[in-house]
A protein has these predicted regions:
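C-terminal alpha-helix
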Residues: 172-183
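P-loop/Walker-type NTP enzyme "switch/lid" segment
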Residues: 1-42, 150-152
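Conserved catalytic-core segment of NTP-binding enzymes
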Residues: 41-139
Length: 183
């Protein structure tokens, strides 16, 4: 666990995570992350687990450990189509591993509000959000080079480009998210 200037802690992924799918092939594999997080869970208000964009063992572990799921997605047809597959995985996790987990909402990232395709995909996603009973957040994260630069520099957007419009987008999203959590 690494402490940051921003007052939060992170456990960064590394190359060792690539082999985790094979390591997690034992009995009870879906509960490994939950067991690992349990000793420190009481020390945090929130634990955010950023999973790969696949629906493998790592993601199932995260869903088994979670109380809420946030779906970040780009405004692309394939990304949006993946939401229904993700919903099927969540339904399976609810049935077999974690009945209390729920999808809290869908967040659009790398969003360009001026592009026709972005608006069309958002309309499609709104229909999908009704199907999976999860709202689309009003806040969206605009496409910005600063996000990729921050990732390349292993920094968060607030430390890397705290006055950027994309940092403002993330602040607005955090505020919207927290209002929903504490409503």
């Amino acid at each position: 666990i690494q402490h940051t200037k921003g007052g939060y802690d992170v456990v960064p992924a590394n190359i060792m995570l690539a082999g985790a799918e094979q390591e997690l092939s034992q009995t009870g594999k879906e509960h490994r992350l939950k067991e690992a997080v349990a000793p420190v869970a009481g020390e945090y208000d929130f634990i955010v687990i950023d999973t790969p964009p696949s629906l493998g063992v790592l993601t199932v572990n995260a869903f088994t450990c979670a109380t809420d799921i946030l779906i970040p997605t780009t405004a692309g047809i394939f990304a949006t189509a993946g939401i229904s597959q993700l919903n099927e995985t969540v339904t399976s996790v609810q049935k077999y591993c974690n009945p209390g987990v729920k999808i809290r909402g869908i967040l659009f990232t790398k969003f360009n509000p001026r592009a026709n395709i972005s608006r069309q995909i958002k309309e499609l996603a709104e229909q999908l959000s009704e199907y999976i009973s999860a709202p689309i957040y009003k806040t969206y994260i605009r496409a910005a080079v600063a996000v990729e630069e921050a990732q390349a520099n292993r920094a968060d957007i607030f430390d890397y480009a705290g006055k950027s419009t994309v940092a403002d987008d993330y602040r607005a999203f955090i505020e919207e998210f927290l209002k929903g959590v504490y409503a």
